[in-house]
A protein has these predicted regions:
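Gly/Pro-rich cap/lid or specificity-loop segments adjacent to the active site
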Residues: 1-143, 267-272, 285-287, 291-292, ...
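Short, flexible loop segments at the rims of nucleotide/cofactor-binding pockets, characterized by
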Residues: 38, 276-282, 306
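Generic secretory/membrane-interface signal
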Residues: 39, 258-259, 302
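Pocket-edge structural micro-motifs
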Residues: 63, 156, 304
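Alpha/beta-hydrolase fold active-site neighborhood
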Residues: 138-281
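Conserved alpha/beta-hydrolase "acid-adjacent" motif
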Residues: 164-168, 308-315
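Short beta-strand/loop motif that positions the catalytic acidic residue
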Residues: 296, 301-304
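Catalytic histidine neighborhood in serine/cysteine hydrolases
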Residues: 318
Length: 318
């Protein structure tokens, strides 16, 4: 029998949204609730299901990406609940650190961007033309939210998977009402097509996954932190001037949460006060027991993806 659980806050497991989280109370109450949607609580749920619904029979687990993180949490605290485990692209670095993750993934994202432009040379100028148009500050997506160069950069989030490069290329091909957006083709103020703006919104919307960016950096928080997370990706971004939205070629960002997302996205904006509090917190549930993992006797097979954009292969192999 295959069991595919909806993790806390997703699917039919009391789906979380800005509206439902707001009902929890003030920003502090919301932040504390969001902490209950992380790995330690998810694994407790799975262990409860194992004991109450499956007669205590040990699982054989398969964890992809974040599922691998959950696997190590499970093996840390309830190893008796697992007969064997398999992970794919999902061995977190232990001890975990959001800062370390982004220090590794931003150089990978720069390389992915350059590879994309090498494959589609015309897209370097086209992406720059879109960014230049957005820099005027008067472009909105169909939901009314501002479309900025920083939001444009986040379209690179899919470049770690196939066929994302092809999709991004096709998207840019429809960007402008006239030509490629250059002054020679479209004049001094090129217009973006409605179809392009809608496709961008469909790519960026968090309507179906509000927790994805909300909890992005907190999945690395393990117990008592030495220092608050304080927008780790934002700090790493600032360390790389080539990623500045005014720099050319325009570099794209990957799986990284930024504070502007919680200002520009109307579905995330209500969560910003709670997320800001979490960014200053240093007390989280412990999610990995290094001693237990070092003594692990449960069979574990791990597949590590070469040049993984999301879970750095170097950190996985360390």
């Amino acid at each position: 029998r295959v069991v595919l659980p909806d993790q806390r806050g997703t699917g039919r497991s009391e789906h979380a949204s800005a509206k439902s989280i707001a009902r929890r109370g003030d920003a502090r109450a919301q932040a504390d609730y969001l902490k209950r949607l992380l790995a330690r609580s998810i694994v407790r749920d799975l262990e409860y299901i194992r004991l109450t619904e499956f007669g205590g029979r040990a699982w054989t687990t398969l964890g992809q990406s974040y599922g691998g993180f959950l696997t190590l949490t499970y093996l840390s605290f309830y190893p008796q609940g697992i007969a064997a485990s398999f992970t794919c692209g999902g061995i977190p670095h232990v001890p975990a650190s959001a800062a370390d993750v982004y220090a590794h993934t931003f150089p990978r994202m720069a390389a992915k961007t350059r590879a994309y432009y090498a494959r589609y040379p015309e897209d370097e100028a086209r992406m720059a033309a879109v960014a230049d148009r957005l820099a005027t500050g008067d472009v909105a997506l169909p939901d009314g939210s501002p479309f900025t160069p920083r939001r444009l950069q986040t379209l690179g989030g899919g470049l770690g998977m196939k066929p994302a490069p092809e999709r991004l290329h096709n998207l840019l091909d429809t960007a402008f009402e006239t030509g490629d957006g250059s002054p020679a083709c479209a004049g001094s103020t090129p217009e973006l097509t409605d179809g392009f703006l809608m496709a961008v919104l469909q790519n960026l919307t968090t309507a179906g996954n509000p927790l994805y960016w909300t909890l992005q950096e907190f999945i690395y928080a393990n117990g008592t932190l030495d220092a608050p997370i304080r927008w780790a990706a934002e700090h790493e971004y600032a360390r790389h001037p080539e990623f500045d939205a005014a720099a050319r070629p325009l570099m794209l960002t990957g799986e990284a949460a930024f504070s502007f997302m919680f200002e520009d996205d109307p579905l995330l904006a209500p969560l910003k006060p709670a997320v800001d509090l979490l960014m200053e917190d240093t007390e989280f549930d412990e999610i990995y027991d290094e001693r237990q993992l070092a003594a692990n006797e449960v069979p574990l097979q791990a597949a590590v993806y070469f040049d993984d954009l999301y879970v750095d292969s170097g950190l996985q192999l360390d």
